Swiss-Prot record:
InterPro entries: GATase_2_dom (IPR017932), GFAT (IPR005855), GFAT_N (IPR047084), GlmS/AgaS_SIS (IPR035466), GlmS/FrlB_SIS (IPR035490), Ntn_hydrolases_N (IPR029055), SIS_dom (IPR001347), SIS_dom_sf (IPR046348). One of its GO terms (cellular component) is cytosol. The gene is glmS. Its EC number is 2.6.1.16. It is an enzyme of class 2 (transferase). This is Glutamine--fructose-6-phosphate aminotransferase [isomerizing]. GO terms for molecular function: carbohydrate derivative binding; glutamine-fructose-6-phosphate transaminase (isomerizing) activity. Its main location: cytoplasm.
Length: 615
């Protein structure tokens, strides 16, 4: 959620930190601040609101030149979005500065202890206690990394901490527990950040920090230890995208750019995973085939858009493998005492690899003996590291808060998992699996075709900008697509939108239908299971008879829907189970255009964060 940047090196620390914070704006925030070490002391600036407010403060009251600094964009949890609650937080002497992501669950008793010892804590935040505790420990040991280890031993909750001390002018110290923090390694300079995007303009070499570790950056190197002080093994890796991938490149918004990048993202996610004979080759799936053959249940855990990918995966997994599949909201999973064992495969889906609810669900599953396969877009993140295996999507950085290309690549990865399980287990649908693999190989071109026909969708969206409600209907895999379309409209347009299984209309939702109410209907292919198609055509007739304005998404050549569609959006003919890959795209464009017409910020919708790293 929050964005954190730290820097030690020869450049202007303030310039590096501010540029890094701007690259992390997509994570969502409501205040920002910086601290630099200069002239034997600390200099800070912080302001509520967007970074432009902090820029203004810095132009009016410049900070001294410095080579060491930290910065933060805050998403309010404890205390409102005010100047006083913005980070960095200082001790009473103004010698320690701390920035923090996460929640310190035992901050209240710690705050009371500090108050009893005479500390004054003017903010409402949980973070402030850390600055005061660090000051106490540093006064005793004169070692900022050791002080951080001692303080972390007293904290409960999930947190990333980054701190500097005026007495250690070339040192930045960080710590992580259940919250992301990554080290950037440059030429004689080092970076700390909650996301590699913060330093990608300077280096693509990174170090992955493990759970309960403290890192110390100095001009001459990096040292990583556990909270207990023992040396820690770390993994270095090279980021496979550059700074231009996280820039708009002429598009009006990151979301529009990322929608347009979907054909390439889909193709990249398939690259190298299908050999010349049409056989799947998933070397990343380190779970032995013999173990996969013993799997008797699959459980998908995810949140938000990734949950909708999981709902679609259920249809594919059960059809191609004949293994029962459950799909769970990660935030609810561990609280209902799920039945798991060594024959259970848990698939954890997360774009960032740091989604806290999904991470906690994963850990619960492993405690019960289940195998965990992660589907993730972010190398070096926590969820892949703590899973038995990982299938990376290759969407590249997704900056807009509302997920688009990550969703399509998650779908591709889910299909690959389902097909691979079917291939390993030798199910009776083996011949069909070969056909589907060939269809998947051509899906990038189908997505490209959809994108080339979106002008009528944009025009329609603009004409509906004054509406307050839009409903979405679908059957089979079209139902999760309807849910995803509704979610996108909620996130971006701030309007009431609901997705329903079309067969549930008569069980309540039909009461919402009124004159000129826009209803988007995702129509399954008339080929194959034609009963699904026939029933949804009846649903369209039913709502249109009650005055609804029908917006119908149907494949090319489907003439049965034409008499009942007020607006018809054509998509390429695709096998039923793969249809979400093309049917979702018009809904993304629709939501983005409608939100823009309403004057909303599509890249950073209100109240939302890109990576939800707290429960």
């Amino acid at each position: 959620m929050c964005g954190i940047v730290g820097y030690v090196g020869p450049q202007s620390a303030l310039d590096v930190v501010m540029a890094g914070l701007k690259r992390l704006e997509y994570r969502g925030y409501d205040s920002a601040g910086v601290a630099v070490l200069a002239d034997g002391g600390l200099a800070t600036a912080k302001r509520a609101g967007k970074l432009v407010n902090l820029d203004k403060e810095l132009s009016e009251h410049p900070l001294p030149a410095a080579a060491t600094g930290i910065g933060h964009t805050r998403w309010a949890t404890h205390g409102g979005p005010t100047d006083a609650n913005a980070h960095p937080h200082l001790d009473n002497a103004g010698r320690v500065a701390v920035v923090h992501n996460g929640i310190i669950e035992n901050f209240a008793p710690l705050r009371a202890e500090l108050a009893e010892r005479g500390h004054e804590l003017p903010s409402e935040t949980d973070t402030e206690v850390v600055a005061h505790l660090l000051a106490e420990e540093y006064s005793a040991c004169a070692d900022l990394a050791e002080a951080m280890r001692l303080v972390c031993g007293r904290l409960e909750g999930a947190f990333t901490l980054v701190a500097v001390h005026a007495d250690a002018p070339d040192v930045v110290v960080g710590a992580r527990r259940n919250s992301p923090l990554v080290v950037g390694v440059g030429e004689g300079e080092y970076f700390l950040a909650s996301d590699v995007a913060a330093f990608i303009a300077h280096t693509r070499d990174a170090v992955e920090l493990g759970q309960d570790q403290v890192v110390e950056l100095r001009r001459d190197g990096v040292r990583v230890t556990g909270f207990d002080g023992s040396p820690a093994d770390v993994r270095s890796y090279h980021v496979d995208w550059d700074a231009s991938a996280a820039e708009k490149c002429g598009y009006a918004s990151f979301m529009l750019k990322e929608i347009a990048e979907q054909p390439k993202a889909v193709a990249d996610t398939l690259l190298g995973r299908i050999d010349g004979s049409g056989t799947l080759s998933l070397d990343e799936v380190r779970i032995p085939p013999g173990v996969l053959r013993e799997v008797d249940k699959v459980v998908v855990v995810a949140c938000g858009t990734a949950f909708h990918a999981g709902l679609i995966a259920k249809y594919a997994i059960e059809h191609w493998t004949r293994i029962p599949c459950e799909v769970e909201l990660a935030s609810e999973f561990r609280y209902r005492d799920p039945i798991l064992d060594q024959q259970t495969l848990v698939v954890a889906i997360s774009q960032s690899g740091e989604t806290m609810d999904t991470l906690m669900a994963l850990r619960h599953a492993r405690e019960q003996g289940a195998r965990v396969l992660a589907i993730c877009n972010t190398n070096g993140s926590t969820i892949p590291r703590e899973s038995d295996a990982v299938l990376y999507t290759h969407a590249g950085p997704e900056v807009a808060v509302a997920s688009t290309k990550a969703f399509l690549t998650q779908l591709v990865a889910c299909y690959l998992v389902a097909l691979y399980l079917g291939q390993v287990r030798g199910t009776k649908y083996g011949d069909e699996i070969g056909d589907v693999v060939r269809d998947l190989s051509g899906i990038s071109g189908a997505v490209e075709r959809v994108l080339g026909t979106m002008d009528p969708v944009r025009q329609l969206a603009r004409s509906l900008a004054h509406k307050n409600t839009v409903l979405f209907l679908g059957r089979h895999v079209g139902h999760p697509v309807a849910l995803e379309g509704a979610l996108k409209l909620k996130e971006l347009a701030y309007m009431h939108a609901e997705g329903f299984a079309a067969g549930e209309l008569k069980h309540g939702p039909i009461a919402l239908i009124e004159e000129d109410l826009p209803v988007v209907v995702v129509v399954p292919s008339p080929r194959g299971r034609s009963v699904l198609h026939d029933k949804i055509v009846s649903n369209i007739q039913e709502i249109r008879a009650r005055g609804a304005r029908t917006i119908v998404i149907a494949e090319e050549g489907d003439e049965a829907v034409v008499p009942y569609a007020d607006h018809l959006v054509r998509i390429p003919a695709t096998p039923t189970l793969l249809q979400p890959l093309v049917a979702t795209v018009p809904l993304q464009v629709f939501a983005c255009e409608l939100a823009t017409a309403r004057g909303n910020e599509v890249d950073q919708p209100r109240n939302l964060a890109k990576s939800v790293t707290v429960e």
